[in-house]
Curated annotation (Swiss-Prot):
It is found in: Cytoplasm. GO terms for cellular component: cytoplasm. This is Acetylglutamate kinase. It is an enzyme of class 2 (transferase). Pathway: Amino-acid biosynthesis; L-arginine biosynthesis; N(2)-acetyl-L-ornithine from L-glutamate: step 2/4. Catalyzes the ATP-dependent phosphorylation of N-acetyl-L-glutamate. NCBIfam families: argB. CDD domains: AAK_NAGK-C. The lineage of its organism: Bacteria, Pseudomonadati, Pseudomonadota, Alphaproteobacteria, Hyphomicrobiales.
Length: 294
């Protein structure tokens, strides 16, 4: 490394210091998903980011998805994926595979990546320590032909109804980094598959996290000129949904951000997980995505 490169690195570290102080002993929940999960280089960079957060005195918690991997496993096992209103129908056989893929293979891959940095990650799902309880999701759609609201039966797709933070509080006092799969039990004894975004929002809300980061395949919320909006209040975000600036798949993402803020999260960020070290760029600089605040 040349002296000029060393000087640049030193300046970057000095610039990061105020942000390290700002977030010291604070909880940051990161929802890991999208393209980054299928790219080994991005996966390694993500693990390094999480490790550095922990080494900087921050309490990081990872929640991950795995829709494409679930679809691939179902296909491999000859089980056809069924969708209602764009949502996967999870029958009894499918939920077993969902749990196997999410809480098994994907979860342990992420744990292994973080552990390779020298940090200690622990793989969990909502069942562990009675951390999360869910109930059957209640979803409706408007029938385009009759314009009548129709109730969807999505099987074992759930919604979070309760989060017990006891286990996560214990882990926060330890050297462990929780990596959580969005699978949880119901009071009825069933196992439920939960949308990873809403699961992460529920976890972050229960912990009153300082930040919730959503790693996506887009830079953040864009204005009508396709320029990144750096910060929005909840009321501004709602206005952009109403006027059509926020549209399509970004609407449920932003609504999940709003729900998380209502639950107690101080700020939620939508950022591009395809950018290497995007988590560090968001936390230790002036920001890399769209920050939504109360």
């Amino acid at each position: 490394m040349t002296s000029s490169e060393s000087e640049i690195q030193a300046r970057l570290l000095a610039q990061a210091l105020p942000f390290m102080q700002k977030y010291e002993n604070k909880t940051i929940v990161v929802k890991y998903g999208g393209h980054a999960m299928g790219d080994s280089t991005l996966g390694k960079a993500f693990a390094e980011d999480i490790a550095l957060l922990k080494q900087s005195g921050i309490n990081p918690i990872v929640v991950h998805g795995g829709g494409p991997q679930i679809g691939a496993m179902l296909s491999k096992m000859g089980i056809e994926s069924k969708f209602e209103g764009g949502l996967r129908v999870t029958d009894a056989k499918t939920v077993e595979i969902v749990e196997m893929v999410l809480a098994g293979s994907i979860n342990k891959e992420i744990v292994a990546l973080i552990n390779q940095t020298g940090e200690w990650a622990i793989g969990l799902c909502g069942k562990d320590g009675n951390m999360v309880f869910a109930e059957k999701a209640k979803k409706t759609v408007i029938d385009p032909d009759s314009n009548i609201e129709r109730v969807l039966d999505l099987g074992f797709v759930g919604e979070v109804v309760e989060v017990d933070r006891t286990l996560l509080d214990l882990l926060a006092k330890s050297e462990m980094i929780p990596v959580i799969a969005p699978v949880a039990p119901g009071r009825d004894g069933a196992t439920y598959n939960i949308n990873a975004d809403t699961f992460a929002g529920a976890i972050a809300g229960a912990l009153h996290a300082t930040r919730l980061l959503f790693l996506t395949d887009v830079p953040g919320v864009l204005d009508k000129n396709k320029e990144l909006i750096k910060e929005l209040t909840v009321s501004e975000a709602r206005a952009l949904i109403k006027d059509g600036t926020i549209s399509g798949g970004m609407i449920p993402k932003v609504e999940t951000c709003i729900d998380a803020i209502k639950a107690g999260v101080q700020g939620v960020v939508i950022l591009n997980g395809k950018t290497p070290h995007s988590v560090l760029l968001e936390i230790f600089t002036e920001g890399a995505g769209t920050l939504i605040v109360p």
